[in-house]
Amino acid sequence: CLRNKKAQASNVRHLEEESNKMHAQRLIQEVDGKCAVVNPPYPPMTTEELDASFDLPYTRVPHPKYKGKRIPAYEMIKFSVNIHRGCFGGCAFCTISAHQGKFITCRSKESIIKEVKKVIEMPDFKGYLSDLGGPSANMYGMHGRNPKACEKCKRPSCIHPQICPNLDTDHSKLIDLYRAVDALPGIKKSFIGSGVRYDLLLHKSKDEKANQAAREYTRELI
């Protein structure tokens, strides 16, 4: 990368492109007479698999080695709940494609509610969730209408330079989730600390139901 920045950029492009595919290829690069092998990522998790990983008996507290010290990063996320995995934004500065991919896997509403109830029981919880989000705040429940098209897609982003016509941008499931969480006894207010993709909100879909849900989500957010 020091000798040839264009070659390095080309190399990274190949890595990013394969990371964003539904069915990636194995990458092999010769280095000093040997071969570096990058195996394809696992397929996106199912909702059941994601629920199982979040339903494990986590303590929600820092490692004992910190011995009660204040950890700023922990303070920021200790009353937050992750609702999905993956992001189809494709931002050039972001590495989510390398470790989560662009295909969204959502937790079930039941799994999320179960975790929120555990947060409510935390001794220093005052009723305010700091974040009900994910890699991006408002991609929950979104996917390609035609999965076969997604399987062949090589685009790094589903929304740039324009929103893919195959993308279902309906925010209805997310609105329903927010309201279910806010209705729980012990919750005074839930905040959205993750980044909101406003291009999804401003998008004019051919589906009027999705347009109405985007307007409703914007009001809910404000």
Describe the residue ranges of each PLM region:
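Flexible, acidic/Gly-rich N-terminal and inter-domain linker regions that tether
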Residues: C1-I77
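Short microdomains enriched in Cys/His and/or Lys/Arg
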Residues: P57, R107-I120
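N-terminal pre-triad scaffold of radical SAM enzymes
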Residues: K67-T95, I113, Y128
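Alpha-helix capping and helix-loop boundary segments enriched in small/acidic/polar residues
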Residues: K78, N82, F103-R107, P165-T169
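Conserved strand-turn element in the central/C-terminal portion of the radical SAM core barrel
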Residues: G90, S97-G101, G193-L201
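Iron-sulfur (Fe-S) cluster-binding segments and ferredoxin-like electron-carrier domains
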Residues: C94-S111
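Conserved SAM/AdoMet-binding glycine-rich loop
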Residues: K118-I222
